[in-house]
Amino acid sequence: GLSGMKFTDEEIEELAERIRAMKKTGTHLCCSIGFLTEKQARMLYDACLDRINHNLNSSRAYYSHICSTHTFDQRVENIHMLQKIGFEICSGGIIGMGESKEDVVDMLMELREIQPEALPINFLLPIKGTPLGDKDISGLTTEYCMKVLCLARLMVPQSDIRCAAGREVYFKGEEKKLLSVVDSIFASGYL
């Protein structure tokens, strides 16, 4: 797989060949690939890739606290370029990185403007040894997580709302409750 800021055209062409092969099965395909040039995005579009995941991750105001390699505006510009080419967009965020409730609302307002076809909400799973490994997640209760998902449903009703990372921790076997709010859940890494 590919992830990051810069890829060679050769790497993208290799991925495009794989996409063309998978499309022969009639599968709807989504890639989470990072930043692309317009030329590279067109290569994937011409290979019949349907959707690209490019999460906002956080609000504009909080973004510099979680990322130093690029700006929030660069993410938004990348998404708009992908939409202009014709891709469906999957874009959401991560809850629990230290953002305020206002940041959650602001992120959802940005997503409402983008109008992604799918909006995944991830709940932070701190991993020791990473920059967010010691993050206090005591505020990520089942009730709070459900409120965030409900807010996403109300604020971005045209998008398929998806509960992604953290579902198995924060909903602890209560996933049936999720289905009253979300369109799909991720289980064992799969939608």
Predicted regions, residues:
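Auxiliary Fe-S-binding modules of radical SAM enzymes
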Residues: K24-T25, R112-L191
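Conserved Radical SAM active-site core
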Residues: G1-G92, M97, K101-I114
